Amino acid sequence: MADLEAVLADVSYLMAMEKSKATPAARASKKILLPEPSIRSVMQKYLEDRGEVTFEKIFSQKLGYLLFRDFCLKHLEEAKPLVEFYEEIKKYEKLETEEERLVCSREIFDTYIMKELLACSHPFSKSAIEHVQGHLVKKQVPPDLFQPYIEEICQNLRGDVFQKFIESDKFTRFCQWKNVELNIHLTMNDFSVHRIIGRGGFGEVYGCRKADTGKMYAMKCLDKKRIKMKQGETLALNERIMLSLVSTGDCPFIVCMSYAFHTPDKLSFILDLMNGGDLHYHLSQHGVFSEADMRFYAAEIILGLEHMHNRFVVYRDLKPANILLDEHGHVRISDLGLACDFSKKKPHASVGTHGYMAPEVLQKGVAYDSSADWFSLGCMLFKLLRGHSPFRQHKTKDKHEIDRMTLTMAVELPDSFSPELRSLLEGLLQRDVNRRLGCLGRGAQEVKESPFFRSLDWQMVFLQKYPPPLIPPRGEVNAADAFDIGSFDEEDTKGIKLLDSDQELYRNFPLTISERWQQEVAETVFDTINAETDRLEARKKTKNKQLGHEEDYALGKDCIMHGYMSKMGNPFLTQWQRRYFYLFPNRLEWRGEGEAPQSLLTMEEIQSVEETQIKERKCLLLKIRGGKQFVLQCDSDPELVQWKKELRDAYREAQQLVQRVPKMKNKPRSPVVELSKVPLIQRGSANGL
């Protein structure tokens, strides 16, 4: 029966993988719902306050770029050629061979440069033209040939074109998507969890599918009780920090994190899913690798290490078991549990795996940095070629002996190694850090310039264009059987109690890596959700032509901000009523649907604006004269933050104004006033609304 369950788990997992690759959006079991377009009023202020409404910030985001491009291509004739030129350059930069770049560069030059020059309408500098012409005459076509044009295209787009985008519906859509992104609160219900694919000291790793996009991931779940039992809180939190540091920027050679979240019992990392097994497993199955095959793995690992080191992260646990293969055979560095940030302070702890640890790591109290990883790389490459670490002769398991040999033994390289390979390994395995390859001031560049890699084009390595020496078998789960992986003994943690102080440690644990979420959405449901939302909004616009739009009331007035919130609706404070609010310098107005009367609360009636919590949801509490309270709830975190800020600012400024004006005797009045207003259907420019 157990065997049957294992087979069914494998089949279910493989089917999910195949469907996710083909049509991930079709596998989505939840729908992303974009907020109302009126969210723009709040989100624009929220983003502006954080310096996010700039050309550079929006153009560099995946969804921002897609919406900006769409606006230019469909609605702005003068910007269309610039965006098309930009896209052709980006395609050129990704070409694999010099021959392809030569053909493509000529086409780009003829279409976007020469044609414009002949028409005397080329809006670019003479230096940019000369730069490209000079290279093409010599048949030199580096990937960055058109970089001067990229800079000038962006310069031309960031002025009036960008301002028109900000005023358009496409920016409204950007605000809608950013609101969704900034309000992500993941739980286990947001994933379909499949079979277990691995286990570590604190928890397990599962294959899973994200419900709203259909994308497959690996879910690494750490048990909070087990962490507490082993006093591993610092390690768990450190892994989350290290993953957040390396998971930005384009690096296909590290198992990166897209999300982190936690439940009362577990810490969860949502990571890139790697289906091809690890190099330790393949070394045991395949046998040792040739120099050519090892070169392939070494090159991709070097680029992974370079990405980490550029972010001042030293990995500290480089070994074949931590190098995972994807379904095509390309590799990624996994498990950053021992990684360390050395930007402010160099580490000196002796951590890692014996047989791969650098001498300076083994010497207690000695500080080190990325130097440790280059020594470990030398050890690992030796193992791929010979089947054992250079310091683990005759399969000894004595850790002290392995460490002693690492500190004292001169590594003897076999005569069968090529001179180029010997040079590389001798450089990496130098005990003296000041003489070690990769530690002489230029980092990874020194290693990449080794004669052993002379035949490689590093741009081709980065683009993963070299054929992998080993392709994992398709239609198989390249992981141990679920029953072989086993499970933890629950008795171990039976006596462990999680206190409020334990949970407080993980208060800031949840995280969404913005660029990875945007990439996931762009690859899966972006077009579908946009099309559906466009249809919905078009229907609402037709319907609202008779009633008018909520936003219309704010036009031509000194309205600071407007949007939907929910307020407590009766004296017993038990029911929420959704209303549309308008914040003015001296008052807060709101209304219901259709022709419901407009209500008003003046700033002079407010005594304070505070944040409170009702049923675990953050709310705004407005204390009003006479001991009354006014409670407001927002649909998202950014809205709550911005409404709180703007209400407090308006209240503070109103208070300062009152203090400057001589006091007048007023009759007591009701704090909330109901306005008899013209129904929205009758509003127009004639009455200034």
UniProtKB/Swiss-Prot annotation:
This is Beta-adrenergic receptor kinase 1. Transmembrane segments: none annotated. In contrast to other AGC family kinases, the catalytic activity is solely regulated by the binding of substrates and ligands, not by phosphorylation of the kinase domain. Its EC number is 2.7.11.15. Ubiquitous; brain, spleen > heart, lung > kidney. The active site is at D317. Belongs to the protein kinase superfamily. AGC Ser/Thr protein kinase family. GPRK subfamily. It comes from the Eukaryota. GO terms for biological process: adenylate cyclase-activating adrenergic receptor signaling pathway; cardiac muscle contraction; desensitization of G protein-coupled receptor signaling pathway; G protein-coupled acetylcholine receptor signaling pathway; G protein-coupled receptor internalization; G protein-coupled receptor signaling pathway; heart development; intracellular protein transport. The PH domain binds anionic phospholipids and helps recruiting ADRBK1 from the cytoplasm to plasma membrane close to activated receptors. It mediates binding to G protein beta and gamma subunits, competing with G-alpha subunits and other G-betagamma effectors. The modification Phosphoserine is found at S670. Residues 191-453 form the Protein kinase domain. Its main location: cytoplasm. Residues 454-521 form the AGC-kinase C-terminal domain. It catalyses: [beta-adrenergic receptor] + ATP = [beta-adrenergic receptor]-phosphate + ADP + H(+). SMART domains: PH, RGS, S_TK_X, S_TKc. Pfam families: PH, Pkinase, RGS. The lineage of its organism: Eukaryota, Metazoa, Chordata, Craniata, Vertebrata.
